[in-house]
UniProtKB/Swiss-Prot annotation:
Keywords: Aminoacyl-tRNA synthetase, ATP-binding, Cytoplasm, Ligase, Nucleotide-binding, Protein biosynthesis. One of its GO terms (biological process) is aspartyl-tRNA aminoacylation. It comes from Bartonella bacilliformis (strain ATCC 35685 / KC583 / Herrer 020/F12,63). It is found in: Cytoplasm. GO terms for cellular component: cytoplasm. This is Aspartate--tRNA(Asp/Asn) ligase. The gene is aspS. L-aspartate binds at E175, R221, H454, R495. It holds the Pfam family GAD.
Length: 596
C-alpha cells in the first residue's frame, strides 16, 4: 500500500465496502457522539467520514488531534445505515472505521476558522491565505477558475488560434495607466516596464507572419484597486487575427465566449445573439457604455415637455444651453413618495442637487401626476410625459437635466439604482452586447487638448480621409467592447497598420514623430515592411470568472491577491531591499517630503 494513501477523500463508494484503505488529509472537524469520535477528513478532492471507536488503538491518538492537523488513517470501508447517509457528499453512503492513525503534521491555533466559513476580516484572510484557500467555497472558486481557463484554451485552439507567450520585461508606455518599472542593473538609470498588455507584441506577431494568436496574458497596471479590478496584476484572454474586419473578430469570438458561459452558467440563460449597440446609443438609452441589459429601464429624452414650462429650473437650463436636454428615467412600480424621496436622498449623497420626480395615481378614469414637477408643468405636460414613457398608476419617473456629456453617467447610475431598488433586474441570466462605434478622440478639459478616447492603435473609421478632413472629435473608431451584466469583459479593435496614419493620429493627440518613434519604435518600424490588416481583442479572465461564480469581489476568485492598499500581506510585499541591492542598481532612496 502507498505510504500515504490508497484513495483520495472523494473516491470511495458503497461498492468499496469491506476494502482496507489508507487515507491522508486535514481534519476538517471532529464530533464526539457518545464517546465515539466522528472525523471529517478533507483533502483536495473531497471529504470522507472517519469513525474512531473507543476500543480502537487509534482512539487515544485521535483524542489529541485538533482541526487542521494532517493525519494518515488506515481502516475498513463500511456502509452507513440508511438514517445517517449524507446525500450532500459523494462519499456519504460510506465511512471508514479507523484501525490506525498517524499524525503527519500539527497545526497551531488557527487565526481564522476553516470549517463553517464565517465572515472574517479580509486582511486576516489574505495574511493567512493558505488557510483561507482551504475553505470549501474558496477551493471551489479557484478550481472553477482553472476549469474556465482550460475551457477557454480548448475553444481557442479548436478555432484555429495558436498560443504564444510574449515578454514580461518591455519598454515603458506611460500614455495609459501607470507602469510598474523595473530598474536595469546593466544599464543603470534605465528601466524596463512590466506590460500593461501585450498590445504591441501581439500586433508585431501579425507583422511576423503569424495569423491567429492568443494567450492567457498577465498584465500589470499601477492603478488604484476596485472591487472589479485587482491592484497590480490581472489576466486577460489576449487575441489578434490577421486579414480581418471588425465583424470577423466579433463573429469569431462571440460563439467562444457564449460557449464558455453556457458551460459554467449553472442553468442561467445566456444571450444567444449578442446585439450591436453604438456607443452613442448606449450612452443615450442607458447612460453607460457598459449597460446592464438585464435592467429593462430605457432612458428617454423628454426635453420637449419642459421648453417654456413653469418648471423654471429645467426651462432655463434648456433656454441657456443649446446642448442641454432633460432625460427621464422610468421607474415602473416606484410610484410612491417614500421611494421617490429615498431616491432623491441617494442622489444628494452622490453629490447631486437631487433627483426630480413625478409619480402617478388614478383619479377616476384619469391619471394624476404628483410631486413638485407635476405641479409646476401642469396636467397636460404631465400626461404627455406619462404617455411617452408608457407609465401607469403606481409608476414614477425621475429627471436629470443639463448637458448630457456631463450628466449621462449620473443618469446611468440612477437607472442602475432604480432597477436594483425595485428588483427589476433579472438575476438568472447573462445578458451580452457588443458596444461599437466608439469615439476615437475626446477633449481633455484639464489640459485643453485632444486625447485618445480609448486605444490609440485602432483604425479610424473613414481612414486617412476622415483624419484629414473631419473634426477629430467627430471621428469614430473601429473599436468595440463586449459587456455583460453591467461589466466590460472584453475590449478590442481593428488596428491601424499604416505608418503615415499612425503619425497623423498621434500628432492630433499632441505626440510628435520623435515621441512616437521613441515610445513605439518597434511597431512603427514594422509598419514599413508589409503590415497586414489585423485586429483583435482582450477579455478579462478574472472578471469572467467573477461573473460566473456570482461573487462581487475579484479577490474571491484569485489565489494570492493584494489588499485594497496594494499590499501583499502574505509575502509582506512591497518590502525594503538591502543597500547593496540598491547600490547595484544605482538607486538612492530619498525620504518622502511632507508638503503639508
Amino acid at each position: 500500500m502507498h505510504r500515504y494513501r490508497s484513495h483520495n477523500c472523494a473516491a470511495l463508494r458503497k461498492c468499496d465496502v469491506g476494502t482496507q484503505v489508507r487515507l491522508s488529509g486535514w481534519v476538517h472537524r471532529v464530533r464526539d457522539h457518545g464517546g465515539i469520535l466522528f472525523v471529517d477528513l478533507r483533502d483536495h478532492f473531497g471529504i470522507t467520514q472517519i469513525v474512531v471507536n473507543p476500543d480502537s488503538s487509534a482512539f487515544q491518538i485521535m483524542e489529541k488531534v485538533r482541526s487542521e492537523w494532517v493525519i494518515c488513517v488506515d481502516g475498513k470501508v463500511c456502509a452507513r445505515s440508511d438514517e445517517v447517509i449524507n446525500t450532500t457528499l459523494p462519499t456519504g453512503e460510506i465511512e471508514i472505521f479507523a484501525d490506525e492513525i498517524e499524525i503527519l503534521s500539527k497545526s497551531d491555533e488557527l487565526p481564522l476558522p476553516v470549517f463553517g466559513e464565517p465572515d472574517y476580516p479580509e486582511d486576516i484572510r489574505l495574511k493567512y491565505r493558505f488557510l483561507d484557500l482551504r475553505r470549501v467555497t474558496m477551493h471551489k472558486n479557484i478550481m472553477r477558475r482553472t476549469e474556465i481557463i482550460s475551457s477557454i484554451r480548448r475553444h481557442m485552439q479548436d478555432s484555429g488560434f495558436t498560443e504564444f507567450t510574449t515578454p514580461l520585461l518591455t519598454a515603458s508606455s506611460p500614455e495609459g495607466a501607470r507602469d510598474f518599472l523595473v530598474p536595469s542593473r546593466i544599464h543603470q538609470g534605465k528601466f524596463y516596464a512590466l506590460p500593461q498588455a501585450p498590445q504591441q507584441y501581439k500586433q508585431l506577431l501579425m507583422m511576423s507572419g503569424f495569423d491567429r494568436y492568443f494567450q492567457i496574458a498577465p498584465c500589470f497596471r499601477d492603478e488604484d484597486p476596485r472591487a472589479d479590478r485587482l491592484p497590480g496584476e490581472f489576466y486577460q484572454l489576449d487575441i489578434e487575427m490577421s486579414f480581418v474586419e471588425q465583424e470577423d473578430v466579433l463573429a469569431t469570438m462571440e460563439p467562444i465566449i457564449r460557449s464558455v458561459f453556457e458551460e459554467f452558467s449553472d442553468g442561467k440563460l445566456v444571450t444567444q445573439s449578442f446585439p450591436r449597440i453604438s456607443y452613442d446609443e448606449a450612452m443615450r438609452k442607458y447612460g453607460s457604455d457598459k449597460p446592464d441589459l438585464r435592467n429593462p429601464i430605457i432612458i428617454e429624452d423628454v426635453s420637449q415637455h419642459f421648453y417654456d414650462s413653469d418648471f423654471k429650473v429645467f426651462a432655463q437650463i434648456l433656454a441657456n444651453n443649446e446642448n442641454a436636454q432633460v432625460w427621464a428615467i422610468p421607474a415602473k412600480t416606484g410610484g410612491n413618495r417614500a421611494f421617490c424621496d429615498r431616491m432623491n436622498g441617494w442622489a444628494q449623497g452622490e453629490g447631486q442637487p437631487g433627483l426630480g420626480y413625478i409619480f402617478w395615481r388614478k383619479e377616476g378614469e384619469n391619471f394624476e401626476g404628483a410631486g413638485p414637477i407635476a405641479k409646476n408643468i401642469g396636467e397636460q405636460r404631465t400626461e404627455a410625459i406619462r404617455t411617452q414613457l408608457g407609465l401607469k398608476e403606481g409608476d414614477a419617473c425621475f429627471f436629470v437635466a443639463g448637458d448630457p456629456k456631463k450628466f449621462a453617467s449620473f443618469a446611468g447610475a440612477s437607472r442602475t439604482r432604480i432597477g436594483e431598488e425595485l428588483d427589476l433586474i433579472d438575476s438568472k441570466c447573462f445578458s451580452f452586447a457588443w458596444i461599437v462605434d466608439f469615439p476615437f478622440f475626446e477633449w481633455n478639459e484639464d489640459e485643453k487638448k485632444i486625447d485618445f478616447a480609448h486605444n490609440p492603435f485602432s483604425m479610424p473609421q473613414g481612414g486617412m480621409n476622415a483624419v484629414d478632413s473631419q473634426d477629430p472629435l467627430t471621428i469614430k473608431a473601429f473599436q468595440y467592447d463586449l459587456v455583460c451584466n453591467g461589466y466590460e469583459i472584453a475590449s478590442g479593435g481593428i488596428r491601424n497598420h499604416s505608418p503615415e496614419m499612425m503619425l497623423k493620429v498621434f500628432n492630433l493627440a499632441g505626440l510628435s514623430r520623435e515621441i512616437v518613434e521613441e515610445r513605439f519604435g518597434g511597431l512603427y518600424r514594422a509598419f514599413h515592411y508589409g503590415a497586414p490588416p489585423h485586429g483583435g481583442m482582450a477579455a478579462g479572465v478574472d472578471r469572467i470568472v467573477m461573473l460566473l461564480q456570482g461573487v462581487k469581489n475579484l479577490r474571491e476568485i484569485s489565489l494570492f491577491p493584494m489588499n485594497q492598499q496594494a499590499l501583499d500581506l502574505l509575502m509582506s510585499a512591497p518590502s525594503d531591499v538591502s543597500a547593496t541591492q540598491l547600490n547595484d542598481l544605482g538607486i538612492r532612496i530619498f525620504p518622502k517630503v511632507n508638503n503639508a
